[in-house]
């Protein structure tokens, strides 16, 4: 192999295959109902995350952030407060909150309330 070809291959292997572009997410810490605060996330972040915590059927708080890994969760019915987490991977995808119907989102709260009455 010629020295020029070797140098070309070494330089080519050092180049990234595609430019790395940072993800844009809405970011807020426990806002009242929802928030719209766009922010450029660090390069190693792969997900926008939204967490909603329901204290009562009419009182909830929303938290949105940039996270390197994310696990979607739905309220399990065993803790005092209902909490759900949603993850997505494109710019400003967490603007609308959780992509589940409101009746489904409130179902765990209603079940927890009924469980507490028993």
UniProtKB/Swiss-Prot annotation:
The gene is LYNX1. Acts in different tissues through interaction to nicotinic acetylcholine receptors (nAChRs). The proposed role as modulator of nAChR activity seems to be dependent on the nAChR subtype and stoichiometry, and to involve an effect on nAChR trafficking and its cell surface expression, and on single channel properties of the nAChR inserted in the plasma membrane. Modulates functional properties of nicotinic acetylcholine receptors (nAChRs) to prevent excessive excitation, and hence neurodegeneration. SMART domains: LU (SM00134). It is a lipid-anchor; GPI-anchor. Residues 96-118 form a propeptide. GO terms for biological process: acetylcholine receptor signaling pathway; regulation of neurotransmitter receptor activity. InterPro entries: Ly-6/neurotoxin-like_GPI-ap (IPR051110), LY6_UPA_recep-like (IPR016054), Snake_toxin-like_sf (IPR045860), Toxin/TOLIP (IPR035076). Residues 1-22 form the signal peptide. GO terms for molecular function: acetylcholine receptor binding; acetylcholine receptor inhibitor activity; acetylcholine receptor regulator activity. It comes from the Eukaryota. Residues 23-107 form the UPAR/Ly6 domain. Induction: Up-regulated by prenatal nicotine exposure. It is found in: Cell membrane; Cell projection, Dendrite; Endoplasmic reticulum. The keyword Hydrolase does not apply. Expressed in lung predominantly in airway epithelial cells, submucous glands, and smooth muscle cells, in endothelial and smooth muscle cells in vessel walls and in alveolar type II cells (at protein level). Also expressed in brain. The keyword Transit peptide does not apply. Interacts with nAChRs containing alpha-4:beta-2 (CHRNA4:CHRNB2) and alpha-7 (CHRNA7) subunits. Interacts with CHRNA4 probably in the endoplasmic reticulum prior to nAChR pentameric assembly. Interacts with KCNA2/Potassium voltage-gated channel subfamily A member 2. Disulfide bonds join 25-48, 28-35, 41-66, 70-87, 88-93. A lipid is attached at residue 95 (GPI-anchor amidated serine). This is Ly-6/neurotoxin-like protein 1. Keywords: Cell membrane, Cell projection, Disulfide bond, Endoplasmic reticulum, Glycoprotein, GPI-anchor, Lipoprotein, Membrane, Signal. Its main location: membrane. It comes from Macaca mulatta (Rhesus macaque). GO terms for cellular component: dendrite; endoplasmic reticulum; plasma membrane; side of membrane; synapse.
């Amino acid at each position: 192999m010629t020295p020029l070809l070797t140098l070309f291959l070494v330089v080519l292997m050092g180049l990234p295959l595609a430019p790395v572009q940072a993800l844009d997410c809405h970011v807020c810490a426990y806002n009242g109902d929802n928030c719209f605060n766009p922010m450029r996330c660090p390069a190693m972040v792969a997900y926008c995350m939204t967490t909603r915590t329901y204290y009562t059927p009419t009182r909830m708080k929303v938290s949105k952030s940039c996270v390197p890994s994310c696990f979607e969760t739905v309220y399990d019915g065993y803790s005092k407060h209902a909490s759900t987490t949603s993850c997505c991977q494109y710019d400003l995808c967490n603007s609308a909150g959780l992509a589940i119907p409101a009746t489904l989102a409130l179902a765990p709260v209603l079940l927890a309330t009924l469980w507490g009455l028993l």
